[in-house]
């Protein structure tokens, strides 16, 4: 089973069209969206924010989609996801012999974005979810990457990932951590123990990931 992973769309409809065409050309029917749907001009307006999310989901209506919110998405994005039957936020979805565990939002930013969560809340929510996983293997689908990896460094080399997510990864060792959020680290991977960390990168710049679940779990990051 192959799944296209995208994130940080930020209102770029042309990028959605491109990835749809790519998916069709590869015969891939599934998407995981790791948040940040709206453009930078509209994310602070609740109505515009939610409409942009609906627009993207309508554009991908012929695919099987799962989604979490990013920090630029309004908290009511979860209501939209439920309306479209795509919600992965604070959910566990079993695929074959593994579980997909989703948590959206990010740690606080300097920009006052609508979906920001404190470190303690992130840790508690993820711990509770993971302790309910019944399969031997699981994947974390997050917006925020863990702290101090190749996947969370800004252009200045400052690491801005979540300390709590790193602690969760160290404690529970998921097979794979999907993330985005830090655009400058898009397309990079790293490891924490045996866990592979991947920053999918911003779809607004045509970056995607292809998750391949076929016994082994593999992630291929690319620009289309």
Model-inferred region functions:
Residues 24, 42, 72-161, 223:
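Conserved catalytic scaffold of divalent metal-dependent phosphoesterases
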Residues 33, 38-56, 145-147, 151-182, ...:
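Cap/insert and terminal regions of metallo-dependent hydrolase folds
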Residues 26, 57-62, 133, 169-172, ...:
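Short, conserved loop/helix-junction motifs that constitute active-site signature segments
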Residues 10-14, 38-41, 69-78, 108-111, ...:
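Active-site environment of divalent metal-dependent phosphoester hydrolases
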Residues 93-97, 117-118, 166-172, 185-224:
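Binuclear metal-dependent phosphoesterase catalytic core
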Residues 5-7, 31-36, 64-71, 87-89, ...:
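Active-site neighborhood of phospho(di)ester-bond hydrolases with catalytic His/Asp-centered motifs
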Residues 13-95:
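Core catalytic region of metal-dependent phosphoesterases/phosphodiesterases
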Residues 1-10, 97-106, 139-143, 196-201, ...:
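Active-site-proximal beta-strand elements of phosphoester/diester hydrolases
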């Amino acid at each position: 089973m192959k799944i296209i992973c995208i994130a940080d769309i930020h209102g770029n409809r042309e990028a959605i069209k491109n990835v749809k065409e790519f998916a069709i050309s590869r015969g891939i029917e599934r998407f995981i969206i790791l948040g940040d749907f709206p453009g930078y001009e509209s994310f602070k307006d609740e109505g515009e924010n939610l409409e942009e999310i609906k627009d993207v989901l309508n554009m991908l209506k012929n695919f099987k989609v799962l989604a979490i919110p990013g920090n630029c998405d309004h908290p009511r994005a979860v209501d939209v996801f439920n309306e479209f039957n795509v919600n992965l936020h604070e959910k566990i979805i079993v695929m074959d012999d593994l579980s997909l565990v989703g948590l959206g939002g990010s740690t606080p930013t300097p920009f006052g974005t609508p979906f920001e969560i404190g470190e303690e809340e992130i840790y508690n929510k993820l711990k509770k979810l993971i302790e309910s996983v019944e399969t031997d293997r699981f994947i974390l689908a997050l917006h925020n990457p863990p702290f101090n990896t190749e996947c969370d460094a800004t252009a200045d080399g400052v690491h801005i990932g979540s300390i709590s997510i790193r602690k969760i990864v160290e404690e529970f060792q998921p097979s794979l951590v999907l993330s985005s959020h830090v655009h400058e680290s898009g397309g990079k991977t790293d490891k924490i123990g045996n866990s592979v960390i991947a920053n999918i990168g911003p779809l607004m710049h045509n970056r995607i990931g292809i998750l391949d679940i076929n016994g082994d779990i593999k992630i291929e990051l690319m620009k289309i």
